[in-house]
Amino acid sequence: TQGGSKQVTHLEGLTEALKFGMDEKPRLVHRLDKETSGVLLLARTRNVAKHLSKAFQQKKTRKIYWAAVAGVPTPNLGTIKYGLVKSTNKDFEKMRCVHPGDVKKIDGAKQAETDYMVLTQLAKRGSWLAMVPVTGRTHQLRAHIAELGHPIIGDKKYGNMSQQNLGDGWGAKLGGDLSDDLHLHARYLKLEHPITKKPLELVADLPPHMAHTWKTFEWSSKDFSDDPFSDFLE
C-alpha cells in the first residue's frame, strides 16, 4: 500500500487518480503488506483521516485476517506473544521473533501479540486460520505463525526451506494445484463510522488464488462468521 524497499508501484502513489471529483486526495489510514489482499480503508478528507488514524492507534477497530498455513497449530485457539525485531542481511529485511522476556534486553525489539483460531483443517497437512493482530507490527502475523512451525502458504520470506514445517506434504503444495502467492487476506474490519458514529463492518471476498485453494480443499467462506472469535466467547 505504501512505497517501501524496492517498491515502485503502490496505492499511495495512485491516490491522485482516486479523487473522483473531490478536492482532496484520499488518505491511507492503515496499511497492508504488498502481498496481502483484503480490506483497505482510505479517508476522503483530512479530518476523517485524523479520526480514523486515532481509532487504529487506540485499538478501537477490530481486524480479522484469514490465512492458509502448512500443518495445524496446537492448541487450536491461542495467543502468540513473541516480540519482534528487524533482522537485515544483504538480500532482504525480515522480522525475527524473540522471547517476550527478552524484548527489553534487545535493541529495537518490540512487544507483539497475535490471537489465532484454527477454523478447519486438511488432516494434519494444512489448515485455515483466523488471526487478530492485537498489536500492529511489521509482518507480525507472518512471523508469528511461522515461528510456531506453520508458515503461511506462499510466504517466500518466512516459509523458506529452513523454516520448520510440521505439515506433511508442504513441498508438494499439500497435494493440490496451489498458487505460490501469499495466502493471507484481510477479511474483516469493524470500526465506528467517523460521521454517523454507527458501527461499520467491512468484508472482502477472497482473491482468486485463495478462492481456488479454498475450492481445492472444499472449504467454504460461508461456514464461519466474519468474527469467529466472538462466536467462541458467546
Language model region names:
Residues T1-E93, G101-E113, Q121-A123, H183, ...:
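RNA pseudouridine synthases
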Residues V134-R137, L206-P208:
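Short solvent-exposed strand/turn elements
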Residues K104-D107, I145-E201, F224, L233-E234:
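Phosphate/ribose-recognition catalytic cores of enzymes acting on nucleotide-derived substrates
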Residues Y116:
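Long C-terminal interaction/binding lobes of large macromolecular proteins
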Residues Q121, V134, L191-P194:
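Active-site beta-strand termini and strand-to-loop segments that position acidic
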Residues L129-V132:
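Short histidine-centered loop motifs in beta-beta connectors
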Residues R125-S127:
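Short alpha-helix capping/helix-loop boundary micro-motifs
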Residues L52, R137-I145:
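Short beta-strand segments enriched for Tyr within beta-sheet-rich domains
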